[in-house]
């Protein structure tokens, strides 16, 4: 996004930080379901949930070497989590993560736009309201 043409809140939705946070949210949601289904041990899920994180600089560094954004992201997350990270991304493709995370970002951006439209609607309905001005 071009910063000078973007509202700060909308820029945040499309930031690298939020993109990776959305990816992590998707990965954690899948791990949680696998745990509920008994496919990930509860102790490993607890470790994943408690330790999962990422470092954007590290992701960039790894991506420069492996030339794959999701592998770079997963490697960074694995460095935070440790051995239990073997369950992260289990049975998933890169598209599963990217597409779902994009949907989360689109929903967030859409909600923001709708809230802005609500303000415009309220302003418009009060446009002809008589007001008293003091000079």
What are these regions (language model features)?
Residues 1-127:
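A helix-coil-helix interface module used to build multimeric assemblies
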Residues 126-135:
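Single conserved hydrophobic/aromatic residue that forms the stacking wall/gate
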């Amino acid at each position: 996004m071009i910063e000078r043409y973007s509202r700060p809140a909308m820029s945040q939705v499309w930031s690298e930080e939020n993109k990776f946070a959305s990816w992590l949210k998707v990965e954690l949601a899948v791990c949680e379901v696998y745990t509920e289904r008994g496919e990930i041990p509860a102790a490993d899920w607890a470790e994943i949930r408690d330790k999962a994180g990422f470092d954007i600089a590290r992701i960039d560094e790894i991506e420069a070497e492996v030339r794959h954004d999701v592998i770079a992201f997963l490697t960074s997350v694995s460095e935070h989590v440790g051995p239990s990270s073997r369950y992260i991304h289990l049975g998933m493709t890169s598209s599963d993560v990217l597409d779902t995370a994009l949907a989360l970002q689109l929903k967030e951006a859409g909600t923001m736009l709708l809230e802005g439209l609500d303000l415009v609607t309220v302003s418009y309905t009060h446009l002809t309201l008589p007001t008293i001005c003091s000079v």
